Design a protein with these regions (language model features):
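Juxta-kinase regulatory segment immediately upstream of eukaryotic protein kinase catalytic domains
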Residues: 1-22
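Conserved ATP-binding subdomain of kinase catalytic cores across diverse folds
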Residues: 21-24, 28-38, 45-47, 52-160, ...
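ATP-dependent phospho-/nucleotidyl transfer catalytic cores
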Residues: 22-26, 50, 58-61, 112-124, ...
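Short, mixed charged/polar active-site loops
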Residues: 43-46, 227
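Catalytic activation segment of kinase domains across protein kinase-like and atypical kinase folds
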Residues: 201, 215-254
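Active-site activation/catalytic loop segments of kinase-like enzymes and analogous catalytic loops
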Residues: 237, 241-285, 301-320
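All-alpha amphipathic helical-bundle segments outside canonical DNA-binding/catalytic cores
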Residues: 287-299
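Long, compositionally biased intrinsically disordered regions
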Residues: 343-346
Length: 360
C-alpha cells in the first residue's frame, strides 16, 4: 500500500517527503488513509487520501464535479470560513483514475468528531453547521449539480419498491411482518408529504447534503465549535427537510436505530430543540413558509422512508443493508416505526419548537 499511496501523492503533487500512512476506520463506503509527509522546514503535515467506492457511487466524476462546485462556491462566498480543500493533479483534476481505482486527496483537519451526544452545545453547533452549509449554497446554480443517487429521497418510489417486495415475498418472510406493513401503508400519504410537495413545486429545490449525521461535522477540540461539514459524496439537489429530518431521525432517538428495546425508542425533544436552534439560527430567515411549516413533519417523513427501506430489504433477503444477524433489518424497521409513532404523538410540540426557534 505504501507504494500505491506514494504514487497517488506524486500525482497530486503533494509537498514534502512521504513518511507513511494510517488507515482510517471511520466510514464504511470509501477506503481512507491519513498520509504523513515531512516538509522542507522539517515540520510534518498530514493529508487524507481516499479510494472512492465506485460500486456505491456509479458516477464518481459527476460526484467530484458536485463537490468542486459546492466547495468553490463556499470558498468564494465565505473566504474566511474553513472549507474542504481537494488537491489537483497536474491536469487540474480533483481526482485520479488509476485503472479501477478512483483517488482523491484533501487536507487533513485536526478536530473532534462525535457519533452520538446529548450535549446541547454540540447539538446546537451541529445544527448550526448544517444550516450554514445550506445557507451558503442558497444562491448556487442548482442545475449545475447532478443527481449522484437518483430518487434517493423519492419516498413514493421507496413505497413502490416495498409494494413489489410484498408481492414477490422472495424469501418467505411476509407472514412475519403484517403489523409493520399495516402501519406503513396507513402512513403512506403522510410519509410522502415532502416528495409530493416537492413534485408539485410547493417546496423549492435546494442543494442538500443528504447524510446529515452528527459525525459528518468536525468540531474544534477545545471549544466544540463546528469547523466544517464533511463527507460531501451525497451532495445533490434535494429538499431542505431531507437534511433536517434525517439529522433529527439519527440524533434525537433515545436509543440506537437498531436497538431491540422498542419501548425505549422515542423522540428526545431536548436533542430536537438544540439541533433546531442551531439549524434555524443560520437558515430561518431564508426559508419559505412551506419549508418552515413542514420542517417538523420532515422528521416523520425521513424516518418512515427508512423504515420502508429496511422492511423492503428484509423481505428481499437482506440484499442492500449490511446485517449482523438474520432479523437485523426487521429490528431496524420496527425501531424506526416506533420512532415514527413517537413523532406522531409529539408532532404538535415539535412544530411549536420549530416556529419558536425561527422567531429568535
Amino acid at each position: 500500500m505504501d507504494e500505491q499511496l506514494k504514487k497517488v501523492c506524486q500525482a497530486f503533487r503533494l509537498p514534502g517527503t512521504y513518511l507513511g500512512y494510517e488507515a482510517i476506520q471511520v466510514g464504511i463506503v470509501n477506503q481512507t488513509y491519513k498520509v504523513n509527509v515531512r516538509l522542507e522546514d522539517g515540520k510534518e503535515k498530514s493529508f487524507l487520501v481516499q479510494n472512492v467506492n465506485t460500486y456505491a457511487f456509479r458516477n464518481p466524476i459527476g460526484l467530484m464535479n458536485n463537490i468542486d462546485l459546492v466547495t468553490e462556491h463556499i470558498r468564494q462566498k465565505c473566504p474566511e470560513k474553513r472549507s474542504l480543500h481537494f488537491h489537483h493533479t497536474e491536469d487540474r483534476k480533483t481526482y485520479l483514475l488509476d485503472g479501477k481505482d478512483f483517488w482523491r486527496v484533501m487536507n487533513y483537519i485536526p478536530s473532534a468528531t462525535y457519533s452520538a451526544t446529548t450535549d446541547p452545545v454540540i447539538l446546537r453547533n451541529a445544527g448550526r453547521a448544517f444550516g450554514e452549509f445550506q445557507a451558503q449554497l442558497l444562491d448556487i446554480d442548482i442545475d449545475q449539480l447532478v443527481e449522484t443517487i437518483p430518487n434517493f429521497h423519492n419516498t413514493r418510489k421507496r413505497y413502490d419498491s416495498l409494494d413489489e417486495a410484498i408481492r414477490l415475498d422472495a424469501v418467505g418472510r411476509l407472514k412475519e411482518v403484517q403489523p409493520e406493513i399495516d402501519y406503513l401503508m396507513k402512513s403512506r400519504d403522510a410519509a410522502c408529504l415532502l416528495t409530493d410537495m416537492g413534485n408539485a413545486g410547493s417546496l423549492p429545490r435546494r442543494v442538500t447534503h443528504n447524510d446529515t449525521k452528527i459525525n459528518n461535522v468536525l468540531f474544534d477540540r477545545d471549544t466544540n465549535d463546528s469547523l466544517v461539514v464533511i463527507d460531501l459524496d451525497t451532495v445533490m439537489p434535494g429538499l431542505m427537510g431531507h437534511d433536517f429530518g434525517d439529522a433529527v431521525r439519527f440524533a434525537a432517538n433515545f436509543v440506537a436505530e437498531d436497538s431491540k428495546e422498542y419501548d425505549k425508542v422515542g423522540i428526545d425533544l431536548a436533542v430536537f430543540t438544540a439541533f433546531a436552534q442551531g439549524f434555524l439560527e443560520k437558515l430561518g430567515t431564508a426559508m419559505t413558509q412551506n419549508e418552515l411549516d413542514t420542517l417538523a413533519q420532515s422528521c416523520f417523513c425521513l424516518t418512515a422512508e427508512l423504515a420502508v427501506r429496511f422492511l423492503d430489504d428484509y423481505l428481499r433477503g437482506d440484499l442492500y443493508f449490511k446485517t449482523s444477524y438474520p432479523a437485523h433489518n426487521l429490528v431496524r424497521a420496527r425501531n424506526q416505526i416506533a420512532l415514527c409513532r413517537s413523532m406522531e404523538a409529539h408532532m404538535d410540540e415539535m412544530n411549536a419548537i420549530v416556529h419558536r426557534c425561527a422567531e429568535v
